[in-house]
């Protein structure tokens, strides 16, 4: 792929592009990343999915929380833009875990990089999914939905399912109102914190990034609901 993007840039120097690359491959090929930057790559999409190592293991992602953070820091150091995607709602996430995901996004200064729909994405379990082999899934799924082509599932904590519904409604309305990503992030955080605190969570405050936002506008897809 390197000769391809180099040749493309040589012939069409004003042309920009984006790529999709796994976190593990970004780590393995970090020496080649400046080539993307120098040949017009606007951003790199990567399916991060979660920042919880247990969940990443269940999803067999091939990277860890630390790997993701390492890649983001390297991107920031060399001037590349990360466009991370997540499966924020899955059968193993907790209110505290969801807040942790938001905190990591804020602390890594990625609020402008994350499309707000990513805060509401729910795991889809298809007919051939390897997740069906997990004992923790068996008790949560319902009969296969032929129309949707997925196995519907419910979270063990009904509050988490309700939070997902509330957040996707919030994101949809915010998109229609053309709200800024930082504003949407703050609203999502508040909704999540309202669920966390009644469950016994204490001592959490808003991420510093909400008050001292550093990130500038990040290149992004023209279709914000693309996942």
What kind of feature is each model-predicted range?
Residues 54, 58-59, 88-97, 111-153, ...:
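Flexible glycine/acidic-rich beta-alpha junction loops that bind and position SAM and/or redox cofactors
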Residues 4-10, 94-111, 139-140:
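Short, electropositive alpha-helical surface patch
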Residues 53-57, 83-87, 173, 204-206, ...:
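Glycine- and acidic
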Residues 1-83, 90-93:
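Conserved SAM/AdoMet-binding glycine-rich loop
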Residues 39, 70-82, 111-113, 163, ...:
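A structural motif corresponding to the C-terminal end of an alpha-helix
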Residues 130-227:
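Radical SAM enzyme core and accessory elements
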Residues 71-75, 82-87, 96, 101-104, ...:
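C-terminal structural cap/anchor segments
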Residues 35-43, 102-121:
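Structural recognition of alpha->loop->beta junctions
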